[in-house]
Amino acid sequence: MNNFRITIVAFLAVLVFTTTVTNSLDEPNMDTISKSREYKCKIDLDCSNHIACRHCSYRNCKCDHGTCKCMP
């Protein structure tokens, strides 16, 4: 019975470890000065759900040199 408990504890520890590592790999880079997440767009479609474009319409949000901006 003691081996079963050790097996369960080891399994849970490995599960928590792999989940933590996987989540940390998915996060974008952090800017060290402002501690904000660095986001670089490549095409206009990358900006469709970005917070910088929430106040402008979908077609007016453009990727301008890696930054999502509302265009007039």
Curated annotation (Swiss-Prot):
<keyword id="KW-0929">Antimicrobial</keyword>
<keyword id="KW-0732">Signal</keyword>
<comment type="similarity">
    <text>Belongs to the DEFL family.</text>
</comment>
<keyword id="KW-0295">Fungicide</keyword>
<dbReference type="GO" id="GO:0005576">
    <property type="term" value="C:extracellular region"/>
</dbReference>
<dbReference type="GO" id="GO:0050832">
    <property type="term" value="P:defense response to fungus"/>
</dbReference>
<keyword id="KW-1015">Disulfide bond</keyword>
<feature type="signal peptide">
    <location>
        <begin position="1"/>
        <end position="24"/>
    </location>
</feature>
<feature type="disulfide bond">
    <location>
        <begin position="41"/>
        <end position="63"/>
    </location>
</feature>
<keyword id="KW-0611">Plant defense</keyword>
<dbReference type="GO" id="GO:0031640">
    <property type="term" value="P:killing of cells of another organism"/>
</dbReference>
<feature type="disulfide bond">
    <location>
        <begin position="53"/>
        <end position="70"/>
    </location>
</feature>
<keyword id="KW-0964">Secreted</keyword>
<feature type="disulfide bond">
    <location>
        <begin position="47"/>
        <end position="68"/>
    </location>
</feature>
<protein>
    <recommendedName>
        <fullName>Defensin-like protein 286</fullName>
    </recommendedName>
</protein>
